[in-house]
Amino acid sequence: MLYPLIRKGIFALEPETAHNLAIKALHIAGNPWLNRALKALLGCPQGTEKTVMGIKFKNPIGLAAGADKNGEAIDGFGAMGFGFIEVGTVTPLAQDGNAKPRQFRIVEAEGIINRNGFNNYGIDHLIENVNKSHYDGTLGINIGKNKITPIEQGKDDYIFCLNKAYNYAHYITVNISSPNTPDLRTLQYGDALDDLLKSIKERQKILAEQYNKYVPIALKIAPDLTEAELVQIADTVRRHQMDGVIATNTTISRDTVQGMKNAAEIGGLSGKPLQHKSTEIIRRLHRELKGDIPIIGSGGIDGVQNAQEKIAAGAELLQIYSGLIYHGPALVKTLVQTIK
């Protein structure tokens, strides 16, 4: 009920400034006493348990990567009632990302454009924060490559992060679909994807033996794929027996926001304008995967109806982020109460 007033204050600030303040506030809310108080205030129920990728999720509603890049606010976000939280995207080395301003709201469409460029403090810093958290849900770590790493050696960055994250994550996501790191999306296609997934699965096997536990690995894909590209990706992830696919990342398309303020800004578009595009990718991907590999649906979820559309299209779990900015923690509660 209070959120419309809070949102007014948030939206008076630059998007990145508002985001940084929110992360600081949620970091403070990680204090055990404050955390209990926030949980009581928000009153989110436990939700319905669901087992996906061999993991028991306390409910199927998760926080998408990008919200908490460095794992600074895991417990604060946890108090909202999320069944799982995905931190990152994180890279081997700290990097500043692209020049500011790099986040833009499209308020009339409830959309956000970002061209952040994987700004983060590096994998070691993230792992330190993960170690300090007390969150009782499922934790995913989303990994990427540094901008300075040539795309031909991108695989090395993913393996480096995989080695570091393996013992601290319930699952790991390989992000090859951000539009804001030059050439990154080329890793989604043909031999490049085949080679990357082969190396990742080989390393996963070694790490599973080393730590005596199996940590599932999901692939995060873009919404801007042709039918042929999607068929090829589906074939490759099945062949390499990936544990999950997250569909989707942000879009470079502007079809749904043409003529609106900030719509011409370069970057990935998320939020409501991505809603139908991501659901359609889920539907097509589900058809290709034939239920063999679970899909985590993400992109424009802002209410029960479109959340259920993604489940009906084939998603087993859901992730939100932009919807949280526009609708506040009440959205988490509504989805947790409703989505089974």
Curated annotation (Swiss-Prot):
The active site is at S178. The keyword Oxidoreductase applies. Pfam families: DHO_dh (PF01180). Its main location: membrane. It is a peripheral membrane protein. SUPFAM superfamilies: FMN-linked oxidoreductases. PROSITE patterns: DHODEHASE_1, DHODEHASE_2. Its EC number is 1.3.5.2. Belongs to the dihydroorotate dehydrogenase family. Type 2 subfamily. This is Dihydroorotate dehydrogenase (quinone).
